[in-house]
Amino acid sequence: MSTIDDVPAATRSFFDHLCGPFFVAFRVLGVCPYTRNRNGVFRKKTVSVSSMYTLISGATFGYATFAAIKTLSRQPPPIAMSNFNRILLKFGYGTLIAPSAFVPVIMWFETTKLQAYLHEWRLFQDNYNRVIGDLDGTIMIVIVKKRVNRIYRSIIVFLLITGVAISWSSSTINDLHVLVCTIKSISIMVFIAGFWFVGAIVIEATIDGYKKKLQTELDRHDSFRFGARSIEDYRLLWLQMSRLVHGVGDYMSATVTFCIFHTTIVVVLSVYALAVWGATLVRLRRYEALASALVALVCNATFLYVYCDCGYSQTKKCVDSVILLILKLKSLARWTTSNYIQITLFLNAVNQYQPNVNVIGFYEINRGLLGSILSCF
């Protein structure tokens, strides 16, 4: 798998460029059937090598997942438990390996929307470069690239360690279907969470660049030379940036909804297992099962943080800084009526349309999901 520096920029947006390693990982895992044209632009083709690979991989792992669930359901419970807890245990087994079968199906239908979203990023970058300046070669993007590459390499190391640990686990080493499906499911969930995290980092860097450029303009010009045209350019760019961030709820609505519910279920089951069986597992010295529950709890709780709060605090700080800059601009001097109106509209736009990276109560995600469902009727 490649890193950022190995992926040609061409006419791709910096968002596409930074997330390139994760798209490669999705393609290898068979969850995202896409190709790239001569300019490196992301696109989906129904008939292509990538699509055939995704279909064959999906069919193979669909069967493997069914066989793995069947195998796990027949295994005796690790300790004595009630019928209700047996059902929960089997449900937990199924939840663990479900992503290997379901996520490729969901992503197959959302790849086209992802392509459209990347195109919107390309259009946004054109306006961003015109108003703010070319971001691709700045020190800030170099720093972000290094940060993203560290995240990507950390994921690879984590998956290698996890794969070795699962391979030596007594509950999976005897069944190839369980082993392969478990590793693929964990890989899919980790890379999707990482992709979401990188998206938050890119948005944070974009807003920060916007804020710094606005600050530079204020320091360079006196208030009378900061014209209505410049203010309007900043306002329209802000609105476009806000729509782009909230568009996350449309382009991967079903995928991220599945991931959030999946991680929530795993967290709840892990807490339940530790609360009900933790003391018993320690007494019986079943440290393997205890460690598995703890790792599942920590990892999935981290994923929930990434989905629901990651990036919010940082982008909120940037947004608040922009608001303060506009208030400073508004109070610099007496403005003409037209300029004062433009600044007021700008301030209202920043207050009402804040591109914060979060999923408040699933609103943004399920808004897109509900729209997709209603469009079918």
Task: Give short role names for the model-derived ranges.
Residues 1-146:
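N-terminal signal-anchor/initial transmembrane insertion module
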Residues 58-97, 123-198, 211-229, 270-302:
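Helix-loop-helix junctions within predominantly alpha-helical proteins
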Residues 93, 97, 120-123, 127, ...:
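Charged, amphipathic alpha-helical oligomerization/scaffolding segments
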Residues 103-124, 196-210, 301-328:
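Inner-leaflet juxtamembrane helices
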